[in-house]
Swiss-Prot record:
Pfam families, per the entry: Tubulin, Tubulin_C
Matches recorded under CDD domains: beta_tubulin
InterPro entries xref list: Beta-tubulin_BS, Beta_tubulin, Tub_FtsZ_C, Tubulin, Tubulin/FtsZ-like_C, Tubulin/FtsZ_2-layer-sand-dom, Tubulin/FtsZ_GTPase_sf, Tubulin_C
Residues the entry annotates as binding GTP: 11, 69, 138, 142-144, 204, 226
Acidic residues: compositionally biased ranges: 429-446
Higher taxonomy: Eukaryota, Viridiplantae, Streptophyta, Embryophyta, Tracheophyta
Keyword GTP-binding: yes
Name of the encoding gene: TUBB3
Entry's family note: Belongs to the tubulin family.
Protein name: Tubulin beta-3 chain
Region span, Disordered: 423-446
Length: 446
């Protein structure tokens, strides 16, 4: 079976990851001891994508949990599903990374990385046909960003032909955790551009807005935010875990979404999102889901798709519905909003349908879009980065761990190049493209 190996790193990654496993266990009928207590054969049909079957009918998550301090892991272990993970798969240090990317990537993290890789290898050897890795981490701190990207590049070396999917929480514009977030995030993006295949971009502020405006929660907690993320993660992978009429896997997803290798940062959305009180006043229909899914307010990162154009997009529907209706609705969106899609990639929206809806809903949909407007986010981080870097503020924390200023300059220009690439394709039209080709041919001839 096509297994996926899940890795979570740092405080944020471990908290998102824990929530993800709660959702997945619930969907597959696995209780908190790892025993199956479900009611449908479909739950077990492809359970080995995410679980290993151990002796005595226990299902153990294919998960590796890492952190540079023990705190988050201890609370995870004592949480509702803490006993389900393999104890050897918890890998942690004692020192912490102190929100310093260099500590995570070069010093503290580098000391721990080999023991993490040993666990990853052990888990990979347990798979029949490993499809790829999914990594949960944040880019603002030290461990998830520094050590997370270190692990991603090491895995890249060892498993070059496997897919690498990340769920990356970007620093948000207004809600800041640490003052050095722009440094950590820029250094991480520099790595993710080169070493990851697909990045699902999340950000706390957008998630706060969804909780506040749409779900009408007065004081959203990180638990609420993580619940939104886990719903999306479950939606992205449901085609791999349940039978469906139009299935996709990590590689199909990449082939359909990534027109140029560096542009692999996606916006994600989820529908239906309604406040608890107004749930019963809305019908769940394919048109409803489609409309809400494409809504800018539903995007889980602080970039507005209306400020750019979609290169590609993919929609995953769950529940009993007609594929014909799904196709009609998706076509409808494209026809009505054709100016928001680049015209030089025809049929750039793909949909897939999985028969099993999430717990408590009759149908749902998950949206993944490759939009040029995501450059707004990189631009924002880059401006904050430049403001501090120009004055060399806080730099001694990084150079003290052996980093070179040159590395900062490279990361900065790589991020700016990425923004420029998005802008270039946002402005490109079908006619221009043909001219480019002629020029290139002439050069070759010359």
């Amino acid at each position: 079976m096509r297994e996926i190996l899940h890795i979570q790193g740092g405080q944020c990654g471990n908290q998102i990851g824990a929530k993800f496993w709660e959702v997945i266990c619930d969907e597959h009928g696995i209780d908190h001891t790892g025993k199956y207590a479900g009611d449908s054969d479909l739950q077990l049909e492809r359970i080995n994508v995410y679980y290993n079957e151990a002796g005595g009918g226990r299902f153990v998550p294919r998960a590796v949990l890492m952190d540079l301090e023990p705190g988050t892991m201890d609370s995870l272990r004592s949480g509702p599903y803490g006993q389900i993970f393999r104890p050897d798969n918890f890998v942690f240090g004692q020192s912490g990374a102190g929100n310093n990317w260099a500590k995570g990537h070069y010093t503290e993290g580098a000391e721990l990385i080999d023991s993490v890789l040993d666990v990853v290898r052990k888990e990979a050897e347990n798979c029949d046909c490993l499809q790829g890795f999914q990594v949960c981490h944040s880019l603002g701190g030290g461990t998830g960003s520094g050590m997370g990207t270190l692990l991603i590049s090491k895995i890249r070396e060892e498993y070059p032909d496997r897919m690498m999917l990340t769920f990356s929480v970007f620093p948000s514009p207004k809600v800041s955790d640490t003052v050095v977030e722009p440094y950590n995030a820029t250094l991480s993006v520099h790595q993710l551009v080169e070493n990851a295949d697909e990045c699902m971009v999340l950000d706390n502020e957008a998630l706060y807005d969804i909780c506040f405006r749409t779900l009408k929660l007065a004081t959203p907690t990180f638990g609420d935010l993580n619940h939104l993320i886990s719903a999306t993660m479950s939606g992205v992978t449901c085609c791999l875990r349940f039978p469906g009429q139009l299935n996709s896997d990590l590689r199909k997803l990449a082939v359909n979404l990534i027109p140029f290798p560096r542009l692999h940062f996606f916006m994600v959305g989820f529908a239906p999102l309604t406040s608890r009180g107004s749930q019963q006043y809305r019908s769940l229909t394919v048109p409803e889901l489609t409309q809400q899914m494409w809504d800018a307010k539903n995007m889980m990162c602080a970039a507005d798709p209306r400020h750019g154009r979609y290169l590609t997009a993919s929609a995953m529907f769950r529940g009993k519905m007609s594929t014909k209706e799904v196709d009609e609705q998706m076509l409808n969106v494209q026809n009505k909003n054709s100016s928001y899609f680049v015209e030089w990639i025809p049929n750039n929206v793909k949909s897939s349908v999985c028969d099993i809806p999430p717990r408590g809903l009759t149908m749902s949909s998950t949206f993944i879009g490759n939009s040029t407007s995501i450059q707004e986010m990189f631009r924002r981080v880059s401006e904050q980065f430049t403001a501090m870097f120009r004055r060399k503020a806080f730099l001694h924390w990084y150079t003290g761990e052996g980093m070179d200023e040159m590395e900062f300059t490279e990361a900065e220009s790589n991020m700016n190049d990425l923004v420029a690439e998005y802008q270039q394709y946002q402005d490109a039209t079908a006619e221009e493209e043909e001219e480019y080709d002629d020029d290139e041919e002439e050069e070759v001839a010359a």
